[in-house]
């Protein structure tokens, strides 16, 4: 115990230097989705909303409403529609304004 304490004082925190330096493990983190409006159709948006376990997605007319604050980055939507949804790679999403986390994605894809 004493050894670990002294080593910790000498080296400081060694598990990560984030945010002072980029975290090497960040590329392995699951991140919220990014949507391609031109690849989204109304039907696809409805299907994505139906499979989202956290209720982070719903369609409002020709807009897919995405609540980043409710998203758990589970990846189901990206697996369902890989052409329209990809991982964003973003995880620094903290904000004091809840409304910033509500994204309105226009649906521009044509129905097949
Ligand atoms: S990653 Fe999961 S929780 Fe987030 S929007 Fe997609 S299905 Fe919903």
Describe the role of every protein-language-model region.
Residues 1-61, 68-70, 74-112:
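Non-ligating segments of multi-cofactor redox enzymes
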């Amino acid at each position: 115990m004493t050894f670990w304490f002294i080593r910790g004082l000498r080296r400081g925190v060694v598990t990560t230097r984030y945010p002072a330096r980029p975290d090497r493990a960040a590329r392995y983190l699951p991140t919220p989705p990014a949507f391609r409006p031109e690849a989204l159709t109304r039907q696809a948006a409805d299907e994505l909303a139906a499979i989202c376990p956290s209720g982070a997605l719903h369609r409002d007319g020709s807009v897919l409403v995405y609540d980043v604050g409710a998203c758990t980055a589970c990846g189901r939507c990206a697996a369902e529609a890989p052409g329209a949804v990809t991982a964003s790679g973003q995880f620094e999403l903290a904000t004091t304004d809840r409304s910033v986390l509500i994204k309105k994605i226009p649906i521009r894809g044509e129905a097949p």
